[in-house]
A protein has these predicted regions:
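Glycine-rich flexible loops
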Residues: 1-188
Length: 188
């Protein structure tokens, strides 16, 4: 499977699971040899994307492939790839429960008894940064050094990994954890 196929496939899976919604959220991978970033296009339903739709952006930030306009959150993905040479995949989501914590500007602290705690004991919530600008990734390097998932204050969440499958799986696990913690909070 090539990079564009991989991005289209996982974007569709994440939309089917309710972690990406309609035109919200974006998925990317980087080819570390060429520096090309393959990212979902802006304002497109992820379920309908084909590999030909996936935007390809070169190391100079120029779009060299794909249909439509690259995601407005390209700068977020680019900053993560620059800061973390070990990362090859980024998922940015507005999933309901992680976003609820982000809207409260609240770190998500996983209880010691939760089995998932080994993956992320604390998901840091960054201060608000204007979406689509360089502000949105302020502090992300430190947050992602602590945990492969972090919250973007007032906005959503990001997961990173060496593979897109793993970044997607981490986001799924983080959303389920956020949901369980939210329900437990509501139960008192």
């Amino acid at each position: 499977m090539n990079h564009a196929e991989e991005v289209a496939k996982f974007a569709a899976i994440l939309e089917q699971k309710g972690l990406l919604s309609g035109i919200e959220g974006n998925v990317s991978v980087i080819d570390r040899e060429t520096g090309h970033i393959f990212i979902t296009p802006s304002r497109r339903m992820k379920l309908l994307l084909t590999p030909e739709d996936i935007c390809v952006v070169d190391a100079n930030g120029e779009q060299v492939g794909g249909t439509g306009r690259r995601s407005s959150e390209f700068f977020l993905h680019e900053a993560i790839y620059r800061a973390r040479p070990d990362v090859r995949a980024v998922v940015h989501s507005h999933s309901p429960y992680l976003t609820a914590y982000a809207l409260r500007y609240e770190d998500l602290v996983v209880p010691e008894t939760a089995s998932i705690r080994g993956f992320f004991p604390r998901m840091v919530c960054l201060p608000f940064g204007q979406p689509g600008t360089h502000e949105i990734h302020r502090g992300i390097e430190n947050a992602l050094a602590q945990c492969p998932v972090c919250l973007l204050g007032g906005h959503g969440a990001v997961s990173v990994s060496g593979t897109l499958e793993d970044a997607a799986a981490l986001l799924c696990a983080a959303e389920n954890t956020a949901k369980a913690l939210w329900v437990a909070r509501m139960m008192g």
